[in-house]
Design a protein with these regions (language model features):
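Short loop/turn segments that connect beta-strands within beta-propeller blades
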Residues: 40-43, 82-85, 123-128, 165-170, ...
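Beta-rich, blade/repeat-based domains predominating
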Residues: 10-23, 53-64, 94-107, 136-149, ...
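Conserved beta-strand positions in repeat-built beta-propeller and related beta-rich domains
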Residues: 28-32, 68-74, 110-116, 152-158, ...
Length: 291
């Protein structure tokens, strides 16, 4: 297993989210400096400044329109950037919403979470936003992904649950067995949903009918944060507490790989166009893991 790192910014920039674009490059959010960066596989980097710099771009995801969409958690907007670097943004109707997770839905729209206001949002290519109120308060909806069942699935960090919403807005909440697990990242492997429990040091799996399994990490203080599936029963995750990248199989077998630089704060993770795993390091770099 080869693990390497590349510097993409100084420590004040805060690389956070990462996604693979439709043109074969990697796209990152620089949460602390208000920029979106494009990184090619040969190391060429372009950075695009956002206004205001304190907008805090957070999670980024490819859209069905060939652009990248991202949340701006500090100024409560949804951003869009083309592969040529042209940006625009749209305000979330509910004030102080704190958008965080974002993903392409099965309906041609982007779906996102509102951490501060217990809502799930939907935005069209033209910027029209619809919001759906969750049946719980103080839930802190975090990451969101499209499920294999045509619905959207999301973590409720403070409600200790996984939520499901259909494209029509019907919502079901599935409580987790472990108290105060604080789920964050979530991904679909095409069969089930996998998620991380940052406070419990576990990886979870939930079937589309709501059956939950949990797998403890060797280091329960590992603080798993983001997770991505590369195939059915093969997921990779970041663990910033243990400064590592982990892998879990469908049977729950876990392997962890230490990052070269200490305390590098890995957050977002994606499968790159080269088949490797790429993680954003908040201290200013990206890590590449060749399986």
């Amino acid at each position: 297993m080869a693990v390497s790192e590349m510097s993409v910014a100084d420590k004040s920039a805060g690389p956070y989210g990462i996604a693979t674009g439709p043109e074969g490059a990697l796209w990152l959010t620089f949460a602390h400096s208000g920029r979106i960066a494009r990184l090619t596989l040969d190391g060429e980097l372009d950075a695009y400044s956002l206004e205001p710099p304190g907008c805090r771009p957070t999670v980024i995801a490819p859209g069905p329109d060939g652009a990248l969409w991202f949340t701006r958690s500090q100024d409560h907007r949804i951003g869009r950037i083309t592969v040529d670097g042209e940006t625009e943004s749209f305000p979330v109707p509910t004030p102080d919403s704190g958008p965080f997770g974002i993903t392409a839905g099965p309906d041609g729209a982007m779906w996102f979470t509102e951490m501060n206001t217990d809502r799930i949002g939907r935005i069209t290519r033209g910027g029209e936003i619809t919001e759906f109120v969750l049946p719980c308060t103080g839930a802190y909806p975090s990451a969101i992904t499209a499920g294999p069942d045509g619905a959207l699935w999301f973590t409720l960090n403070q409600a200790n649950a996984i939520g499901r919403i259909t494209v029509h807005g019907d919502i079901v909440i599935h409580p987790l067995p472990t108290p105060s697990a604080a789920p964050v990242g979530i991904t679909s492997d095409g069969s089930a949903l996998w998620f991380v429990e940052i406070a419990a040091g576990q990886i979870g799996r939930i079937s589309v009918d709501g059956a939950v399994e949990e797998f403890p990490l060797p280091d329960r203080a590992a603080k798993p944060h983001a997770i991505v599936a590369v195939s059915t029963g093969d997921c990779w995750f970041t663990a910033w507490g243990s400064n590592s990248i982990g892998r879990i199989t469908g049977s729950g077998k876990i392997a962890e790989y230490s990052l070269p630089s200490p305390s590098s704060e890995p957050h977002g993770i994606t499968q790159g166009p080269d088949g490797a795993l790429w993680a954003a390091l908040e201290t200013g770099g990206v890590a590449r893991i060749e399986p």
